[in-house]
Structure formats: C-alpha cells, structure tokens
Amino acid sequence: LTYKDEPVEAQDTETEKHGKTTVIAAPVAGEIVPIEEVPDATFSEGLLGHGFAVKPEEGRIYAPFDGTCLTIFDTLHALGLKSESGVELLIHVGLETVDLNGAPFKAHVKSGDKIIKGQLLLEFDMDAIRAAGCPTITPVLVTNEDEVGSVVVRDGMIIVGGPEISEASMKMEPQAVAAGE
C-alpha cells in the first residue's frame, strides 16, 4: 500500500477484467485516514486486505460501483461487494460493531443483490455506535488484491491497478442515485 500526493485522472467507464478503467465512488462521506492508523491490528496490518479508512460524516453507505452485494453480515456491520470488473471490497462500519448485533444498522440490500453506483446500501446510527463505546471509523479494503494488483491511495482517492485491471479509483465524495433512475 502506498500513498501519493499527485492527482489522478480516471474515466467513468464500464470495466472488464482486462485493461479498461473504472471510477469507484466513495462509499461513505468523511475524512480519509490511512489504514495503518486504524486502531485495530486486523485492519491496520492488512490482514483482511489493503485500502483506507474513513471517519464518516454521516451514517450512510453507498454503492461505490456497479456490481453485486456478495454478502451482508447478519449483524449488518459489514458488506462485501464485487464490481463488474472484479474488484472486491469489504466495507466494515466502525470497530467492534459486530457486538451491537445489528441494532444501529438498517440494510437496504441483501446478499446477491445487484447494485448500482450511488445506491444507498446501509444506514447506521453514528450516535448509537459511539454510545456503545465503538469507534465509527470505517475501513474500506480491497480483499482480492492478489487478483487486481497493488492498492495505491492518492490525494483522497484509492487506485487499484495490476495486470488484470489497469486502474480503478475511489473518489471520496459519494453521490446518491435519485429514486427511479
């Protein structure tokens, strides 16, 4: 995992596993934090994958790309997503939130659902999470880095690149999709 300051240009295009580019919108609005600064070794040491974390400004998780919801945990604290290009992400809302048994969460998708970029996937009550003594910092990890190549975070964006996916970038400002579009 490397961090770069130079801006990155990316195109918002359909993606295939070989050579095209995809823009991946941020799943949650907030301040980006290097994954190494997450106060949980499971995330900070890259045991589940590399990426970044976000200190959320609001309690909403949006689809960062078109693809599929691979899994939503029974406790609703985490989502596994797969883009049409094959990038797999784990979005883990807060730390130790598995112990909250789903109470502060409301899912808008289920495992196996197709998702579209900007679609609301999950809502969470940040005050309830904090009241339970859990940090709200939200790790966002590429879990199949071995298939997509290196993970580089640049100036508020995450870049996934390698021999099979030439580039995918994660913008840090989610946009909701209007109903009916």
Residue ranges, per PLM feature:
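Contiguous, well-folded functional domains in the mature portion of proteins
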Residues: 2-181
